[in-house]
A protein has these predicted regions:
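A general structural signal marking secondary-structure boundaries and capping sites
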Residues: 78, 174-177, 229
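Short, hydrophobic secondary-structure boundary micro-motifs
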Residues: 16, 83, 180-183, 208, ...
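Non-transmembrane alpha-helical segments in soluble domains
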Residues: 71, 75, 94-97, 101, ...
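GST-like fold's C-terminal all-alpha helical module
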Residues: 105-219
Length: 237
């Protein structure tokens, strides 16, 4: 049996890490027998490849890190996440996943870590009960990273404008389809739905939530993806 090592969840989130939720959806789609194991100990997290989650542990104890690494691992075992897609659609899917995982993710990081309202929500949820000093030190490192990417150097209005542009682009791709590339879930849905869900409610800052909530078609889409995934999706203890 495969084991997904993941950050915990709560408040309706399978995990507060959207990449962990992505990995869980990929595991569900793969048909593999798997289980969830939450990682709470910082020392255990430090021993993970890349010192981050998600990570899958296989029956031999081998650790497979990163949501895209997990996808490749599952594909090597026979999983087919983009069945029925043309070569062009597969290229579009790959580009969309990169936009979500790298552009929308930066929006989410700013909405949770940079904005004071978002950070207050993080302290009440993700870091509830954790001593403030190490958490604040960790936040400072995250903010340094966001500054290095350049994203946090934009003012709020510019960030929100870019968020609106990205969400509008995804909404255009979705159209009137059930999922992004038709009537069946594909790999792109596993990335996109959890990220939009995270931007649509706390602990994301209210300004980002407001922009995301204006896209009702995307919110309905997120519900479809999560409902399909949740048929047997493990829940946080």
């Amino acid at each position: 049996m495969l084991t997904l090592l993941t950050h915990g969840g709560g408040d309706g989130f399978y995990s507060y890490s959207m990449f962990c939720t992505k990995a869980a959806l990929l595991l569900q789609m793969s048909g593999e027998d798997w289980q969830r194991q939450d990682v709470h100990d910082p020392a255990e997290l430090a021993r993970m490849p890349h010192t981050k989650l998600p990570v899958v542990r296989d029956d031999t104890g081998t650790l497979i890190p990163d949501s895209e690494g997990i996808r490749r691992f599952l594909e090597d075992r026979g999983a087919e996440f983009d069945a029925g897609l043309s070569a062009v659609q597969k290229g579009q899917s790959r580009a969309l996943i990169r936009m979500v995982d790298e552009s929308l993710w930066l929006q989410l990081m700013c909405a949770r870590w940079l904005e004071d309202d978002g950070w207050a929500g993080m302290l009440q949820t993700v870091f509830s009960g954790v001593p403030k000093e190490p958490v604040n030190e960790f936040r400072a490192k995250v903010l340094d990273g966001l500054h290095f990417t350049g994203h946090s150097r934009f003012d709020r209005a510019e960030r929100l404008k870019r968020l609106e542009q990205d969400l509008t682009a995804i909404e255009s791709i979705l159209g009137d389809q059930r999922f992004l590339f038709g009537g069946q879930m594909t790999a792109a849905d596993c990335s996109t739905a959890p990220m939009i869900e995270a931007l649509s409610r706390a602990p994301a800052a209210p300004q980002a939530v407001e922009v995301t909530q204006r896209h009702g078609k995307l919110l309905a889409y997120v519900s479809r993806v999560m409902e399909q995934g949740a048929l047997t999706l493990p829940q946080a203890a």
